[in-house]
UniProtKB/Swiss-Prot annotation:
Chain segments carrying region Disordered: 36-55, 223-275
UniProt cross-references to PANTHER family, sorted A to Z: LARGE RIBOSOMAL SUBUNIT PROTEIN UL2M, RIBOSOMAL PROTEIN L2
Protein name (Swiss-Prot/TrEMBL): Large ribosomal subunit protein uL2
Annotated family: Belongs to the universal ribosomal protein uL2 family.
One GO biological process term: cytoplasmic translation
Xref: PROSITE patterns: RIBOSOMAL_L2
Biased composition (Basic and acidic residues): 229-239
Function: One of the primary rRNA binding proteins. Required for association of the 30S and 50S subunits to form the 70S ribosome, for tRNA binding and peptide bond formation. It has been suggested to have peptidyltransferase activity; this is somewhat controversial. Makes several contacts with the 16S rRNA in the 70S ribosome.
Pfam families listed in its UniProt record: Ribosomal_L2, Ribosomal_L2_C
One term of GO molecular function: transferase activity
């Protein structure tokens, strides 16, 4: 895996930096683990925009990734590592000893031909999945469950990981990449290691069209709109925000906390914001 800065043969390629991985599989995905997905361009069932800046983009098939990893005691061989257009991380196609195949999130260092294992007796090796009660304190883990059996929800993006800080009774403490310290049940499962493709965040798209390929539409500034469309809109000539910066719906846009309280707030030991 390497970062490649392209030659400035055009304005769009002048600042472009790509992540090139020659080891990725170049064929089609495993047909049995692929589903069609339709685009809705950010509209709901009545045709109104509910999510801005979405629309267009290249057609994609959804890869069915196994986030539960609950086939305990059955070794699986890594057949290939593939690109997945639906996420920043790469995925690995594994084949269990009984012939079943599945996609998993590819951790850093996972290579074709290696064996991965799930279950309480699995060795502490990158790609293996164990209950948190069987993982040594201080280990770096990814694809962590929030509820036992629900499937991985934390640390699934490229280059992300979680550190296991402590175990106290039925709960363990994890430090997330954001700085938040959170409790999860020790029966929740996690994979050993760091998610691969860690250079994903260093790429530069180079041109606006690359975002359009991804289905991301332009973001218009509020000060360029009319007053009916945005709190910053209107005025003669170029004007500023005219006060506190606000969202299109009137909420303060900078520093205002919008997170609602939840029942699971009791599981947060330390917030990511330093108070």
């Amino acid at each position: 895996m390497a970062l490649v800065k392209l030659k400035p043969t055009s304005a769009g390629r002048r600042a472009m930096v790509k992540v090139v991985n020659a080891d990725l599989y170049k064929g089609r995905p495993h047909a049995a683990l692929v589903e069609k997905q339709s685009k809705n361009a950010g509209r709901n069932n009545s045709g109104r925009i509910t999510v801005r800046h979405q629309g267009g983009g290249h057609k994609q098939h959804y890869r069915l990734v196994d986030f539960r990893r609950n086939k305990d005691g059955i070794a699986a061989r890594v057949e290939r590592v593939e690109y997945d257009p639906n996420r920043s991380a790469n995925i690995a196609l594994i084949c269990y000893a009984d012939g079943e195949r599945a996609y998993i999130i590819a951790p850093k260092g996972l290579e074709v031909g290696q064996t991965v294992l799930s279950g309480p007796e699995a060795p502490i090796k990158a790609g293996n999945v164990l209950p948190i009660r069987n993982i040594p304190v201080g280990s770096t883990i990814h694809c962590v469950e929030l509820m036992p059996g629900k499937g991985a929800q934390i640390a699934r993006a490229a280059g992300t990981s979680v550190q296991l800080l402590a175990r106290e009774g039925a709960y363990a403490q994890l430090r997330l990449r954001s700085g938040e310290v959170r409790r999860v049940h020790v029966e929740c499962r996690a994979a050993i290691g760091v998610v691969g493709n860690e250079e994903h965040g260093l790429r530069k798209i180079g041109k606006a069209g690359a975002n359009r390929w991804r289905g991301i539409r332009p973001t218009v500034r509020g000060v360029a709109m009319n007053p009916v469309d945005h709190p910053h809109g209107g005025g003669e000539g170029r004007t500023g925000e005219g006060g506190v910066a606000r969202s299109p719906w009137g909420q303060p846009a900078k520093g205002y906390r919008t997170r609602s309280n939840k029942r699971t707030d009791t599981m947060i030991v330390q917030r990511r914001h330093k108070r």
